[in-house]
A protein has these predicted regions:
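Intrinsic disorder/low-complexity signal
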Residues: 1, 16-18, 22, 56, ...
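N-terminal capping/linker segments that flank leucine-rich repeat
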Residues: 1-30, 199-264
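Concave beta-strand-loop units of leucine-rich repeat
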Residues: 23-30, 38, 42-53, 61-74, ...
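Canonical leucine-rich repeat
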Residues: 34, 56, 77-80, 98-102, ...
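Intrinsically disordered, low-complexity segments enriched in glycine/proline and serine/threonine
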Residues: 35, 60, 81, 85, ...
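Cross-kingdom leucine-rich repeat
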Residues: 6-12, 18, 112-119, 156
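Short, exposed beta-strand/loop patches in secreted or surface proteins that constitute
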Residues: 9-18, 39-40, 60, 81, ...
Length: 264
């Protein structure tokens, strides 16, 4: 333990787990497991990259800073931390086919690229990611399962995506996929409609599920006020004429539609 710890470690008598006040880094040590040790809370970073670890069992449940487990023959993220204060990185692990066990909360970015992940449906239903999300260079055919809100960049290039079904509802940074790049701050229903109408055949096919009136109606039913604001620039478009709004929002809809016409 001392060899890999920068700070102080202690055995919690209540939980039987090893807590670290500082950083733990056992990278490039040819470890096959954590030798029966079960970590609890790490105040700093936890890194176990470039080993022979086949399972994340024993990893801490809480990491205050970054968590890195890249270049290991793991099959899933089961056993990994539930809370990561910094960036979660698991890349260059060709054996990784599932994101099941991913953290529920990531303070910064979630980086899961250059693996063999086939689906993102194993991610926690209400997963929170502070900044970016990168799932590039896997074997994804859809984005179903990703968090609804990404404050930073969202990257999914180098996959087998048939469409952008399941893409985040909000992207604060740049959106990047094969054949489509949307600049920072421009991810909106207005932009997606524009691509659906005027984009290349590939781009139109990619965004089609995101502008499907049935999908949008479901989002309206879940959050009518929020969707009213998101759609204000396209409310009068023929594509959305059949959308149904709560009776109390009809006047607001007309007002926002008029504001959208004048660019407000």
């Amino acid at each position: 333990m001392d060899k890999y710890t920068k700070g102080a470690w202690s055995l919690n008598p209540t939980t039987g787990e090893v807590d670290v006040d500082g950083d733990f880094d056992c990278s490039v040590s040819r470890l096959q497991s954590f030798g029966g040790i079960k970590f609890g809370e790490i105040s700093g970073s936890f890194k176990c990259t470039r080993n022979l670890i086949t399972s994340l069992e024993g990893c801490p449940h809480t990491v205050g800073a970054d968590f890195e487990c890249s270049v290991n023959p793991i099959l899933s993220l089961e056993g990994g931390p539930k809370t990561v204060g910094g960036t979660f990185t698991c890349q260059n692990s060709p054996s990784l086919t599932s994101v099941s066990g991913a953290p529920e909360t990531v303070g910064r970015s979630f980086l899961c690229l250059l693996n063999s992940v086939e689906s993102l449906e194993g991610l926690p239903e209400n997963m929170s990611v502070g900044t970016g999300f990168d799932c590039s260079y896997n074997y994804l055919t859809s984005l179903v399962g990703v968090p609804k809100i990404i404050s930073g960049d969202f990257r999914c290039t180098g996959n087998d995506l048939k469409s952008l079904e399941g893409a985040p509802q909000t992207v604060g940074g740049e959106f990047s996929s094969d054949g489509l790049k949307i600049p920072e701050g421009e991810w909106s229903m207005d932009t997606l409609i524009g691509i659906f109408l005027d984009g290349t055949p590939q781009q139109k096919h990619l965004v089609a599920p995101l502008v499907d009136p049935k999908v949008i109606q479901q989002q309206i039913d879940e959050n009518p006020e929020g969707m009213l604001v998101k759609l204000k620039g396209v409310l009068k478009h023929p594509h959305f004429r059949g959308l149904k709004w709560p009776e109390g929002l009809e006047k607001e809809k007309d007002l926002l539609s008029d504001l959208g016409d004048v660019g407000l």
